[in-house]
Amino acid sequence: MSTYILVVDDESDVESMFRQHFRRDLRAGRFTMEFANSAPAALEQVKRNPDPSLILSDINMPGMSGLEMLPRVKAARPNVPVIMVTAYGDEATRKKATELGAAGFLTKPIDFGLLRREIDQRMERTA
């Protein structure tokens, strides 16, 4: 089964940045990535895809934040790990994300080496 990663972020450059950093993996079919530019769009994608392997979500988005989205994702897909990716790396935000069910927490600017290790670990667990 192919690893499917959903990236949720309202910033317009996120998709191109992720596709650039993971271009070899994507070309090799190691995993697939889809992108949602809002929490409601992500929730729709979670409903449509029967088995996302990993969700990476920004926290600060207009309308519905990643923290507001997190319990809804966990209710629909309790076994899918969600890693929060945010510019707000303070302890209160980290604690709130963990309490809501986040499997991990990364701060922006994104350390793509660290993110790759997170993805590799998740892929090993599901293999």
Q: Residue locations for each model-derived region?
A:
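Receiver (REC) domain active-site loop signature in two-component systems and cognate sites
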Residues: 61
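Alpha4 helix (beta4-alpha4-beta5 surface) of REC/receiver domains from two-component response regulators
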Residues: 68, 89-104, 117
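Active-site beta3 strand of CheY-like receiver
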Residues: 50-56
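Two-component/phosphorelay signaling modules centered on CheY-like receiver
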Residues: 12-34
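Receiver (REC) domain switch/active-site region of two-component response regulators
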Residues: 111, 120
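A Lys-centered signature of the CheY-like receiver
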Residues: 108
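Acidic catalytic/metal-coordinating carboxylates
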Residues: 38-41, 65-68
